[in-house]
Amino acid sequence: MGEKLMKAALDNGQGDYLVQKVPFPKRFKNSALIKVIQSGICGSDIHLTTERNESQILPSGHEVAGEIIEIGNNNKNLVPGDRVAVEMIGAGRACLNCIYCKNGQMRHCIHRIEDTGGGFGEYITRLPSGLFKLPDSLDWTNGALVEPMAVSVHALRYSQMQKGDIVGVVGSSTIGLSSIVVAKTFGAKKVIASARYPQQIEAAKKMGADVVVSSKSGEFEDACFDASGGIGADIVVESIGGHQSETFHQSIRATKSQGKMVYLGGMKIPMELDLIDASLREIRIESVMCYSESNGIHDYEIAIDLLDSNRFPYKDIVTHRFNLENIQKGFDIASDKKSGSIKVHITM
């Protein structure tokens, strides 16, 4: 028999995604084979597409929900046919034995297994430690939203947000919106959000933000101080990142003295930093990325429970869906917020 092939979308190095036949993903000892059902296009996927100048060998895509096709013995009682959200980056590739894994920080594993490709292909392989069973009450759309929700769960757990805190969120794209939901769920007294596009403003309100302002300079800072009696937000989450640095400084300005600025967006350019204000006001700047396990509970588990509670209509942020053959249209729409897009999903 010949090599088994599947369909996958690969960037040709010029920003164009071409669907082609590629070998099935490599299997490692104890890894599971999962059929991808739905995947989200992340902002990082868009940024990497604009920066990549060589053709991809493996498909990307890390916001994944799928069905287990094959799985060996595991301690999570997972069996073929189970519907799962897949933690692609950390737990799904972790050795589980290094100092980081033993402390629940699988994303920092120093012996991670080789990457075998992501959710823009028909099949993926990951270790059972990165598979989280979806309840029957969650559909595939929610399943593919577990990953971005877990990012915000991790950010606000890591920052040790307290009930009654005033939380600011800079940006109302996918991660900003999930940060609003998590902050409200964790008991924030008020959540102040900034948003640039009409669909983001509407979504931020639906997700529970108490105050939503435009992205114009000064409006967010003023709103955070107004909401806190002139003190500033206890925690500000910077969720935008990208090829600019203004939102980093804006987040610091909106944070109260001895408060926390959670740097979640990830800037892709060199930055000139004037940190004298942050130093004088003893603001703690916390860099946060992805997800982990704390007190024996993974951020994915909390994200699944939060989505299953249906307290906030987070599923509504998925504005567009395309099948794999039309993934290029998906990237075009996801890149153009004037199209009305927030989250774009790819279905198999």
Question: Residue locations for each model-derived region?
Answer:
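C-terminal substrate-binding/catalytic core of Rossmann-like NAD(P)-dependent dehydrogenases/reductases
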Residues: 269-320, 328-329
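Short glycine-/small-residue-rich Rossmann-like dinucleotide-binding loops
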Residues: 40, 72, 89, 240-241, ...
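Mid-domain Rossmann-like dinucleotide-binding core that forms the NAD(H)/NADP(H) cofactor-binding site
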Residues: 138-217, 222
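Glycine-rich cofactor phosphate-binding loops and adjacent beta1-alpha1 units
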Residues: 202, 206-284
